[in-house]
């Protein structure tokens, strides 16, 4: 009997497998559509950042047709409520004094920091878009929109653009001395900035999901991993520091609104600003440590931003209370020590939170044996190697530039430029016990 030939073995397809050519084509079309929408959002965000920077430059110059300097919100030299120069509040002692606000150069510094940070983030997203386009052409990335959303998702771009346009309107209103309207509009800018910073830090997902997605990106492209990982962490810290400054501004803007509409006394308006700033800052630092730090472990932006805000507000408060000492002493003699004590306690709290975050980040990276921990451990060795290279070169340059020429020129501290190997060995032994 002849042997029966077996036909080709048919492949069994799982009923749960929906990967068909039609589905792949549909996924590709949706990915292309999402990618193009994301590119449009990036362009609009870049336009918003450019317009904000252009508005600040125009509002800072007297030759652009804008009537007033936007940063001069209050004028402590004027004591007449009928003059324009800021928002004014009376008191029981018969005086008339402006409310507490930042000095003009501080306002300029913070607003330009906001604009430059937005410009840097716009350049960052444009570079990311170019690299994703290149990697997609090289067949290293399949879903370009998914990788783009790991860097900046569309929700973040939307709220970021809205916050930039609101700040642009605030600057123009301040330049036209519409202080009350500008202060009210800044409350909306603060709300959008909170949403923008929150989404930019966490992408609206759980921390473990973000960590796994970024880790898997290393297999596709090292450049994209660096953009979505370490580089993005730097921008998160910049935005976190900016959020602390926004808390300072919204506290003072709320003070302007209260003083302008409720006509409160001098000490009442200052108390509103100080209580709002201290409360929001403490809540922000705690939320950053308990929630946001799970996404970016080396998150030092909130503490540093709060520390800078305390120093800036302390400088403005000192100048304010020095000029208006008489009405303050009449209304509330305890206002000056209370303000100083509040700012000092908040500054100490921000330093404590900064040290706590650095310690927890170090412990986390040491347990994970991450690349960041390895890079940190190599820093002292690199510094010592750099010092060994610089010291002999510096010593030779001194002897070359100052020859003795027979005069017996002697350097008293010439031994400080020589490398003492015994000290280095003792230093290494002393550090070995800590490893």
UniProtKB/Swiss-Prot annotation:
N-glycosylated. It holds the Pfam family Herpes_glycop. It is a multi-pass membrane protein. Residues 58-111, 177-178, 255-265, 318-334 are virion surface. It is found in: Virion membrane; Host Golgi apparatus, Host trans-Golgi network; Host endosome membrane; Host nucleus inner membrane. GO terms for cellular component: host cell endosome membrane; host cell Golgi apparatus; host cell nuclear inner membrane; membrane; viral envelope; virion membrane. The keyword Lipoprotein does not apply. Residues 1-36, 133-155, 200-233, 289-294, 356-435 are intravirion. Coiled coil: none annotated. Keywords: Disulfide bond, Glycoprotein, Host endosome, Host Golgi apparatus, Host membrane, Host nucleus, Membrane, Transmembrane, Transmembrane helix, Viral envelope protein, Virion. The chain crosses the membrane at residues 37-57, 112-132, 156-176, 179-199, 234-254, 266-288, 295-317, 335-355. Envelope glycoprotein important for virion assembly and egress. Plays a role in the correct incorporation of gH-gL into virion membrane. Directs the glycoprotein N (gN) to the host trans-Golgi network. Interacts (via N-terminus) with gN (via N-terminus). The gM-gN heterodimer forms the gCII complex. Belongs to the herpesviridae glycoprotein M family. This is Envelope glycoprotein M. It comes from Varicella-zoster virus (strain Oka vaccine). The gene is gM.
């Amino acid at each position: 009997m002849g042997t029966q030939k077996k036909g080709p073995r048919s492949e069994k397809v799982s009923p749960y497998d929906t990967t068909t050519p039609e589905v792949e084509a549909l996924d590709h079309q949706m990915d292309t559509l999402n990618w193009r929408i994301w590119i449009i959002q990036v362009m609009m965000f870049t336009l918003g950042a450019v317009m904000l920077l252009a508005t600040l430059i125009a509002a800072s110059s007297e030759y652009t047709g804008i009537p007033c300097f936007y940063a001069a919100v209050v004028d402590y030299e004027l004591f007449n409520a009928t003059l324009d120069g800021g928002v004014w509040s009376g008191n029981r002692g018969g005086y008339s004094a402006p409310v507490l606000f930042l000095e003009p150069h501080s306002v300029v510094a913070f607003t330009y920091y906001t604009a430059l940070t937005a410009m840097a983030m716009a350049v960052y997203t444009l570079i990311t878009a170019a690299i994703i386009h290149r990697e997609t052409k090289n067949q290293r990335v399949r879903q370009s929109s998914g990788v783009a959303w790991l860097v900046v998702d569309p929700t973040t771009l939307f709220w970021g653009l809205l916050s930039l346009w609101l700040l642009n309107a605030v600057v123009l209103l301040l330049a036209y001395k519409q202080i009350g309207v500008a202060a009210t509009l800044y409350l909306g800018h603060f709300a959008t900035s909170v949403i923008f910073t929150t989404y930019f830090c966490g992408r609206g997902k759980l921390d473990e999901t973000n960590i796994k997605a970024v880790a898997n990106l290393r297999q596709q492209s090292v450049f994209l991993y660096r953009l979505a990982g370490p580089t993005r962490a730097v921008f998160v810290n910049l935005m976190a520091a900016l959020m602390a400054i926004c808390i300072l501004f919204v506290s003072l803007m709320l003070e302007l609104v209260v003083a302008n509409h409720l006509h409160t006394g001098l000490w009442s308006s200052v108390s509103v600003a100080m209580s709002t700033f201290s409360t929001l800052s403490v809540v922000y630092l705690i939320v950053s440590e308990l929630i946001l730090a799970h996404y970016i472990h080396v998150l030092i932006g909130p503490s540093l931003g709060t520390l800078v805000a305390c120093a800036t507000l302390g400088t403005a408060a000192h100048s304010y209370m020095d000029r208006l000492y008489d009405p303050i002493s009449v209304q509330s003699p305890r206002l000056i020590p209370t303000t100083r004590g509040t700012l000092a306690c908040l500054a100490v709290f921000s330093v404590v939170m900064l040290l706590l975050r650095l310690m927890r980040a170090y412990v986390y990276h040491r347990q994970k044996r991450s690349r960041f921990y390895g890079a940190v451990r190599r820093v002292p060795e690199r510094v010592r190697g750099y010092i060994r290279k610089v010291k002999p070169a510096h010593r030779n340059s001194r002897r070359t530039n100052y020859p003795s020429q027979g005069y017996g020129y002697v350097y008293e501290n010439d031994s400080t430029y020589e490398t003492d190997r015994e000290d280095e060995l003792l230093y290494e032994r002393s550090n070995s016990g800590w490893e």
